[in-house]
Amino acid sequence: MNLNFSDEQQMLRDQVQKFCESDYSFNKREEILKSDLGYDADLWKLFSELGWLSLPFAEENGGFGYGPIELSVLFEEFGKVLIVEPYLSTIVLSGSVLDKSSYDGRADLIESITSGASHISLAYLEEGSKNNPAFANTTIANSAGSLTLNGTKTLVLNGGNASKLIVSAMMDDELVLAIVDADAEGLSKITYPTIDAQSCAEISFENVQLDNAAIISKGSESIDLLNNAINIATLCISAESIGCMTACYL
C-alpha cells in the first residue's frame, strides 16, 4: 500500500504551508480575532483565488473533486497556525450537504461560497440533541403550500456572519433540510465565541416564512447528508489537531 502523497497533494501541502508560515503569524491571528467579523475577509477572498474553497466540490459543481486526503492536508497545515477563517462551517459542513444533495438550487449556492462572496452555515444542533443529527424539535408547518419555520438552533458555527443557513427541521413527520435567508423576518441571533475563539451563534426562528423551493432534502436523504458532512468535519478537525500538536511539540 502506497501511503505517500501524490504530486498534486504534495503541491497543495507546500502551497498551504508556505502561506501559513509567511502570512499567518500569531499576532496576525490575534488581530483577526479582535475584528468585528472574527475572520479576515481579504484572506477569505485569497483562499478563493488559490482554489482552496473549491477543493472538495465535485467537478460538475464547479470544484476540483478532491476528497478527504486533500482536506486533511489542508487542515493539518491550518492547525499549525490555528487559522480562524470559517472553512469548516462554510465549505466542509454546509458545502458537503449541498455538494451531495439533489437540490436544484445547489449550483448557485456552491458558486456563491466558492467565489468567497457569501457564507452558509449549517444549523442542526439543538438543546437535547446530544449530537444526534436526526433529532429536531424545530418544525416547519406545511399548510396549503405555505411553510412556517419555528425553533432554536445552538452552536451554529459562523452563524453571525452567514448570509444563508441550512436548517434541519421536522416537516410532515420527517426530517428536512431547508435553506433560509439569515436576514429573514422572525429570525434572531445571539453570537458568542467558542472556547477556541471561533465565532458561533444561537439562532431562533419565530414564524419564519419559507417557500417550497427552500427545501433541500427530505427524510433519509437529510440524515445521510448530515451524517456525511459530520464525518468529513470530524476528519478535518482530527487533521487540524495533528497540526496543532505538531506545532507544539515538534
Regions of interest found by a model, annotated:
Residues 4-12, 79-80, 93, 187-250:
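Glycine-rich beta->alpha junctions and the first turn(s) of the following alpha-helix
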Residues 9, 20, 74, 151, ...:
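Residue-level signal for inorganic ion chemistry
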Residues 27-49:
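Short secondary-structure junction/hinge motifs that connect adjacent elements
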Residues 48-107, 111-116, 158-161:
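Internal helix-loop-helix
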Residues 87, 128-131, 155-158, 192-196:
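Short Gly/Pro-enriched turn/cap motifs at secondary-structure boundaries
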Residues 116-127:
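A short, Trp-centered hydrophobic/proline-enriched beta-strand micro-motif
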Residues 138-141:
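A structural signal for short hydrophobic beta-strand segments in well-ordered beta-sheet cores
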Residues 150-187:
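A short core secondary-structure module
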